[in-house]
């Protein structure tokens, strides 16, 4: 059985190696295509359980101000502009200034890095907003932006005022706990409309 599986998968390896050279989005989309080529239908978790997606509007008790709304719009525009480079799904802004961009480290580590910079006095801007959304053309079946209680805790440690995510395109893990942590930390969590095209 093991030998037969190895012989079967061996011809697929050049494709897998090509996918690895293109970043996360290309890798995940390529894997989905390989399964589809074998007759499988690939669906996202949100296709099976749409209730895991954040709707438009506030998740907890707090809402962004008008100035914070402007930063949210700028963050979404930034993510759309950097999407073709497969940089990441998140950016942190404060008063129209980019403070951090998610890369290979992921959202939690980006927030930890931001907290360290703030503790070291490298960031003087008060507050800030984590904006998270899928990048244009991203295969959302395989890589949907996600937040949860740990994200909110990381945002609080980084001194942020809140989190804005693409409504209907972001998974919220443990929504009740996420809401409770956001309210406890006095952070807003809000689903906002995003115009990034879906693949």
Predicted features and spans:
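Short, ordered loop/turn segments at secondary-structure junctions
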Residues: 21, 47-48, 104, 133-135, ...
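Electropositive phosphate-/nucleotide-binding environments in soluble metabolic enzymes
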Residues: 21-25, 29, 65-73, 85, ...
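Internal active-site segments that recognize and position negatively charged phosphoryl groups
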Residues: 31-47, 51-108, 112
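Short coil/turn connectors at secondary-structure junctions
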Residues: 37-40, 86-89, 94-97, 123-128, ...
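Glycine- and Gly-Pro-enriched alpha-helical subdomains that act as flexible
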Residues: 91, 95-152
